[in-house]
Structures are given as structure tokens and as C-alpha cells.
């Protein structure tokens, strides 16, 4: 009898150890994904993040492209005199500011796009940790506000070019310089679209942070 009891205990100990191991795996399984990285978002959300980042890159590059090609020469009538006029984006500090901010946004978005696509292709979470989420959230916020200020400053100069100055002989410069003004207007429009896309990315990152506990 004593020998039989000893054999029973020897057999039961491994079973209880296996059961405890299974319980530990079951408890930790849903909380940890891929080596301790939390993944509150699914595959669709990761794909949406990459699409938004791609669109932001395209719109910011388009804003830069249209602005740097905005230049034209023509003539304008002031007090009956036909005077030659030449306009170029680099003549205005507001337009230079818009080009600088748009280029910075394009570089930031392209870098984040490459990182996100590499993670997506490896089937890893696009946002791997809270620290990474906070970092890109801060970057998106800063660039969104900078883009708003640049677009607003450029819009003021463009509006002055289109309306002229009241009570003076200064005309609507966009009539003889329509190519220049149209390029500037398109650039400003894409700058504001980039700002909206950055805001959408920031919202997605806030949702990620609210769902993540790690």
C-alpha cells in the first residue's frame, strides 16, 4: 500500500504542474501579443493608419510642388501706365514658411509611413508601444498646428493679391498673374488637407492610447 501511494503521488505531481502551466498561459494569453506587446487595434485599424499616413505624404508633397512652381511675369495697369510685374513664391515670407512647413510634414509623414509599412508587412502592430504612440502623437500635433498657421498666413497674402487694396490704385494682381495665384491657391488647399489628415491620425493615436494599458 505504501509503495502504491508513493507511485500515485509521483504521477499526480506532473499533472498538477501541467494544469498550473496551462492556467498561466490562458490568463496571460489575451493580454500579451507578440512578446509582451499590447495590441488594442486590429489589422484594419493598422491598415487605415498606413493609408492616412500615405495620403498625408501625398498632400504635403503636392502642396510643396504647387508652391515652388508658382511664378509668372506679366503687365498691370496702374494710373493708365502699363507696368511689368513679376511674382514668385520666394518673394513672400508667408509662402516660404508654407513651403518649409509642408516639406517638414512630408519628411515626417514619409518616415512614419516607411516604419508603419515595414511593421505591417511583418504582421507586427503598427504602433508597438505607448511610448511610440506618444511620440508620433506629439509629432502629428505639432505639425498640424504648424500647417494651420502656415496655411492661414499664406491665405492672407493670396486674398490681398486677389482683392487688391481699397482706396488705392493697386489692382487685383491675380488677373494678370492668374497662373501664379492658381498655383498658390492649390498649394494652400492641399496644406489644409494635410492638416486634417494629421488631425485624423492624432485622433486614432488617442484612441489607441485610451485602449492600451502598456
Curated annotation (Swiss-Prot):
What is known about its subunit structure?
A: Homodimer and heterodimers.
Q: Name the glycosylated positions.
A: 161
Q: How does it sit in the membrane?
A: Multi-pass membrane protein
Looking at the UniProt entry, the stretches that span the membrane are 50-70, 97-117, 133-153, 183-203
Write out the similarity annotation.
Belongs to the Casparian strip membrane proteins (CASP) family.
Q: Which organism is it from?
A: Ricinus communis (Castor bean)
GO cellular component annotations of the record: plasma membrane
Q: What is this protein called?
A: CASP-like protein 3A1
| Key word Membrane present | yes
Q: Which InterPro entries match?
A: CASP/CASPL, CASP_dom
List residues in topological domain: Extracellular: 71-96, 154-182
The alphabetized UniProt keywords are: Cell membrane, Glycoprotein, Membrane, Transmembrane, Transmembrane helix
Intracellular or extracellular location(s): Cell membrane
Q: Which residue stretches are annotated as topological domain Cytoplasmic?
A: 1-49, 118-132, 204-214
The record's section on NCBIfam families has: A_tha_TIGR01569
Amino acid at each position: 500500500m505504501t509503495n502504491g501511494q508513493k507511485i500515485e503521488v509521483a504521477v499526480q505531481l506532473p499533472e498538477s504542474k501541467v494544469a498550473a502551466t496551462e492556467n498561466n498561459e490562458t490568463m496571460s494569453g489575451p493580454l500579451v501579443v507578440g512578446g509582451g506587446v499590447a495590441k488594442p487595434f486590429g489589422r484594419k485599424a493598422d491598415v487605415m493608419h498606413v493609408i492616412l499616413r500615405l495620403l498625408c505624404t501625398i498632400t504635403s508633397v503636392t502642396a510643396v510642388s504647387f508652391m515652388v512652381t508658382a511664378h509668372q511675369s506679366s503687365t498691370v495697369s496702374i494710373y493708365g501706365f502699363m507696368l511689368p510685374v513679376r511674382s514668385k513664391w520666394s518673394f513672400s515670407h508667408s509662402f516660404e514658411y508654407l513651403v518649409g512647413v509642408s516639406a517638414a510634414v512630408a519628411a515626417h509623414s514619409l518616415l512614419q509611413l516607411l516604419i508603419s509599412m515595414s511593421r505591417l508587412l511583418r504582421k507586427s502592430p503598427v504602433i508597438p508601444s505607448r511610448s511610440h504612440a506618444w511620440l508620433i502623437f506629439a509629432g502629428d500635433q505639432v505639425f498640424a498646428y504648424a500647417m494651420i498657421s502656415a496655411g492661414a498666413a499664406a491665405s492672407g497674402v493670396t486674398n490681398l493679391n486677389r482683392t487688391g487694396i481699397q482706396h488705392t490704385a493697386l489692382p487685383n494682381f491675380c488677373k494678370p498673374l492668374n497662373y501664379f495665384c492658381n498655383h498658390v491657391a492649390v498649394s494652400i488647399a492641399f496644406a489644409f488637407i494635410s492638416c486634417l489628415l494629421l488631425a485624423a491620425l492624432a485622433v486614432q493615436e488617442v484612441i489607441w492610447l485610451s485602449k492600451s494599458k502598456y
